[in-house]
Amino acid sequence: MAGQKIRIRLKAYDHEVIDTSARKIVDTVTRTGAKVAGPVPLPTEKNVYCVIRSPHKYKDSREHFEMRTHKRLIDIIDPTPKTVDSLMRLDLPAGVDIEIKL
């Protein structure tokens, strides 16, 4: 797999969970002998939802809720077959969305 690069993009609502997952990935990759660039924090996506507080009237009284999506980017340079195998076996929390590109 010489000359290749694996790009891993992580998304989660909780920043602590995504940081521990990124740390696990970096530790696993460095143990297998590949080079790692990252984790690079990408801009946090913020969605704001506006809801009327009352079920019937009082349109002027509203409540705002927000949902933040934290993102990280990890590049693995010159991965070995052992690196790919260890990444496949890695156990990550359920709240983390993983996107892998070769």
UniProtKB/Swiss-Prot annotation:
The keyword Ribosomal protein applies. SUPFAM superfamilies: Ribosomal protein S10. Signal peptide: none annotated. One of its GO terms (biological process) is translation. Keywords: Ribonucleoprotein, Ribosomal protein. GO terms for cellular component: ribonucleoprotein complex; ribosome. Pfam families: Ribosomal_S10. GO terms for molecular function: structural constituent of ribosome; tRNA binding. Involved in the binding of tRNA to the ribosomes. Belongs to the universal ribosomal protein uS10 family. Part of the 30S ribosomal subunit. PANTHER family: 30S RIBOSOMAL PROTEIN S10 FAMILY MEMBER. This is Small ribosomal subunit protein uS10.
